[in-house]
Structures are given as C-alpha cells and as structure tokens.
Amino acid sequence: MSASVCARVAGFISAGRTGGLGVAGAFAKAWDEGFMEASLRSWWRIAARVRREQATVEQATVEQSGAAGERAVARVKPQVLATGANQVWAWDITDLPTAFRGVAFKAYAIIDIFSRKVIVASVHQRESTADAMALFMAAIAAEGGCVPQVVHADNGAVMRSNLLNEFLTAHGIEVSHSRPRVSNDNPYIESEFRTLKNRASYPGVFASLVEASTYVAQHVHWYNHAHHHSGIALYTPAQVHDGSWKILHARRQVSLAYYQARHPERFRGHRAPVPAPKAWAGINHPGPE
C-alpha cells in the first residue's frame, strides 16, 4: 500500500474520531464517499500504527516538558459508550501484596462496562504482554467467540504494548486509553478492584500464587452472581449481562404493587416505579442522543 493511500486512510480515521466515529464507521463513511483503496483490516492496522506513533510523540513531549519544567499538552479525553453487553470491555492490573516488602502478585481482570460483569480474571507473578493476550483469548472464548467493539485501558506498559494492540485490532477491536495521571478515566474496573479489596474476606497479604488465584476466583463468582450492584439497580452483573434481570424486574413490580396496595398511607399517592438498569454506560460520554 502506497504512502499516499496510508496517509489518506489516516486522515479519514482522524476526521472520523473527531466526529465520533470509530475505525469501522470512518471506513464506511469513506466508502460512501467513493474512497475504497484498502480493506477494513488494513484500516485497523493503520489505526494501530497511528496510535503507536502518537503515543511515542506524546511520551517524548511529556519527557521534554518535564526536563524543561513545562507542562505537556493534555491528551484528548477518551469517550466510549455501551448500550448493551459485550460492546465495551475495560481492563486493568492490580497488585495483591505478599509477605515480602515490594513484592506483589498481579491480578488481571476484564469487565463489561454495561453489565459490570467480570468477563475473566487471572493472577500472575508479574505483568506481561503474553499473560494479557492469554487473558483476552480466554475472555473471547468465555463469551462464545463474541468480541467487543472497544477495549479501554489505562497507560501501563502492557496496556500499550504493540503485540497486544495488534492482537486486539486483528480481532476488529478498537483500543481506547485513559489520559496520563487521570484517575477517573477507567472507573468501572477501578471500582471492581476496590470491591475486591474492601471485602471482609480479603486477607490483605497472600502467602502464595495459589492462594491469591483462589481468592480472586471466589471473588469473581460472588461478584458476578451474588453481588447486588448499586450501579445496576441492585441486580447482579450476571443478570444484567444475560438479560435475566427483566424476569426479576417483573417480579419486583408485582411485589412492590402488593406492598403499595397494603400500605397506601406510606406512599402519599406517589407510586414509585421499580428501578431498572440504565440503558447505557459510558466513560466520559454524555450518553446516546
């Protein structure tokens, strides 16, 4: 593919991102406008290359600014939106302390931001691209081959590794990253990690990799199937993920109506509806129009 075609594709991708389009959307728009010089897979490869180049430039800018005592130009705020399960996954790695100072096991996890379900989690001795790729292969298999439209992560070395990003883009997945040093750009997975570490059963220190892996596996099962999450109207993540919350919602409506009929004086004429999970979830996104 010629450099001029690559440049035009990169221009379409950049313009599409400004207009709220992902890579596939920009490809379709260009196609509608009569530009068809490369396959969608090639567009994904070019998009990944552009991101890597931008990351290199941004890192150099940060380093130069730090040396000169100047403030680096802020990265554009990421915006992702999900209106259903398996549209957007977020992932991260957190430390699980051991008895040795400065030594921690690494817990990897992927969460669906719409349903809050932990798709898959694992624990390893260290952070590595190979383990991250294995995590995503396991997640895709766990969802019956379904892949998300977007994967969001922070700016860790593994999260920005070329091999991982090429693996994701090869599966047609758009990659999104938090801004450097912005703590609330990856809120869903951070919230899940806080839940993991704030439970009464959390040991605080892990004696072995097996112990850490066992704790995380037990936590994920509880979190997905028994944790009535306040962010999804007190349904479990598994119920929202597979849609079974709707059956329970109908039951809740019947129970509430019965309660209201027995005690009308407690409602003063106001009949509150049964809360349902929001129709969308996002990161720095105002919501669907």
Where are these regions (language model features)?
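C-terminal domain-tail junction helix/linker
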Residues: 169-171, 195-289
